[in-house]
Design a protein with these regions (language model features):
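Conserved small/polar residues in nucleotide/adenosyl-binding loops
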Residues: 2-8, 359-366
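Conserved donor-binding/catalytic core segment of Leloir-type glycosyltransferases
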Residues: 39, 193-212, 218-222
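Short hydrophobic beta-strand element within catalytic cores of glycosyltransferases
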Residues: 311-314, 324, 330-331
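Donor nucleotide-sugar binding/catalytic pocket of nucleotide-sugar-dependent glycosyltransferases
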Residues: 14, 148-159, 166-182
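Aromatic "clamp/platform" in nucleotide-sugar-dependent glycosyltransferases that forms part
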Residues: 294
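Nucleotide-activated donor-binding/catalytic signature segment of Leloir-type glycosyltransferases, i.e.
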Residues: 252-277
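Nucleotide-sugar donor-binding and catalytic loop/hinge architecture
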Residues: 28-35, 183-198, 233-235
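Extended catalytic core of nucleotide-activated donor transferases of GT-like folds
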Residues: 22, 26-29, 39-41, 74-160, ...
Length: 371
């Protein structure tokens, strides 16, 4: 398939970069060679979590009046790239002595090969990495050679990475404050019913459906509200919204989701691109956000939902537990399960959490009665 070919090509590039790195010698940080400040390098225009992560760092440095520049860089295909928040500030110039590179370890070698050794030379290089399991892929370990330090969004990620390096690994959580805009969108804009209690499940196809686990949320919803005609009638004012970002990355995702919701007229499927302002408004427009994820490095959408005042139902495991607990969200119990096969980049034999629907089923009803 096209995806497999692309993965093989990327693996080849990474191997090439590893060979090149062994031949290269990155010049160590030299104080005074460059001005004090930060070069933020990442998918600044990206509509995905990596892009949002880089923009959060830019905003944080802005608010603290720290000198910095912003360089837009992504490893193809990169997904949709429509965010223009920092469009007028993008530059190729890197005048400062610290690089903060928002490229995950999986693509860090490609970034090195693409950007060039001179970007690394004489600077203090920080990789801002997210990862979602408690073990780290062996093939990504060479990426540690390219950094002086690693920052992560959660202790969950930090504790994993510390097993593999003696270099500093520091938790720098996302400072969540969704970009605001004077334009607000109501439910009518999204073709959603204005008179129903709506749950929302949202994920990016590039984030691996088996990890995001939307099928568990759909199953829990159907069990609670669509089990039979009597239940449907009783809860006719309740609905579930499924929003897939970048659905074009996985036609298989669309097909699977479509097959499990086709008999439910109170499940509303949304795909296609949304601007950041639309996403923020959608999070505020619904009544509850649901994430029965198997693992999260941080869980930005959950944090953003809480920020705009929308209650969250979430699996009680991984990065999200560092900013939510049973006092602030509806936490769902889980069993740890072993991956039965590879779900790239997550390898067979690793473990992650599987939300217990036994615990989940009453929760949506509890939410509707307590909202």
């Amino acid at each position: 398939s096209e995806m497999c070919i692309r993965d093989r090509m990327k693996a080849g590039i990474i191997n090439n970069a590893t060979d090149k790195l062994s031949a290269d010698s990155i010049e160590k940080y030299e104080a005074g060679r460059y001005k004090c400040g930060a070069n933020i390098i990442g998918n600044i225009k990206g509509d995905n979590g990596l892009g949002q992560s880089a923009r959060i760092m830019c905003r944080l440095l802005d608010e603290n009046k720290e000198p910095h520049v912003i360089r837009d860089f992504f490893v193809p295909p990169g997904g949709s790239r429509s965010n223009d928040t920092y469009a007028d500030r993008l530059t190729e110039e890197l005048p400062f002595d610290v690089n903060i590179i928002h490229v995950n370890a999986s693509e860090f070698m490609v970034a090195y090969l693409s950007l060039g050794k001179e970007v690394w030379d004489y600077r203090y290089n920080i990789g801002y990495w997210a990862w979602e399991l408690e073990t780290f892929p062996e093939e990504w370990l060479p990426a540690f050679k390219l950094v002086d330090e690693v920052w992560t969004p959660s202790d969950f990620v930090t504790n994993t990475l510390k097993k593999y390096t003696d270099k500093p690994v520091i938790t720098v959580p996302h400072c969540v404050a969704p970009e605001t805009d004077t334009v607000k969108f109501d439910r009518k804009h999204f073709n959603l019913p204005e008179d129903k209690f709506l749950f929302l499940v949202m994920y990016n196809s590039g984030s691996v459906m088996e990890r995001k686990n939307p099928l568990a949320a759909i199953k829990a919803f159907k069990e609670a509200f669509c089990k039979d005609e009597q239940t449907k009638e009783k809860y006719k004012d309740v609905g579930l919204v499924i929003k897939i970002s970048e659905a074009e990355l996985s036609a298989e995702d669309e097909k699977i989701i479509g097959s499990v919701i086709e008999d439910c007229d109170n499940i509303y499927y949304m795909c296609g691109h949304m601007g950041r302002c639309e996403v923020n408004t959608l999070l505020a427009d619904v009544d509850v956000y649901v994430s029965l994820h198997r693992s999260e490095g941080f869980g930005l959408v959950m944090a953003e939902s809480m920020y705009v005042g929308t209650p969250v139902i979430a699996t009680d495991w991984s990065g999200n537990t560092e900013f939510m607990n049973s006092d602030t969200a509806c936490m769902v119990g889980y069993d740890m399960i072993e991956l039965d096969k590879d779900y790239e980049p997550f390898k067979k034999g690793n473990v992650w959490a599987d939300a217990c629907l036994l615990y989940t089923s009453p929760s949506p009803r509890d939410s509707t009665s307590s909202r």
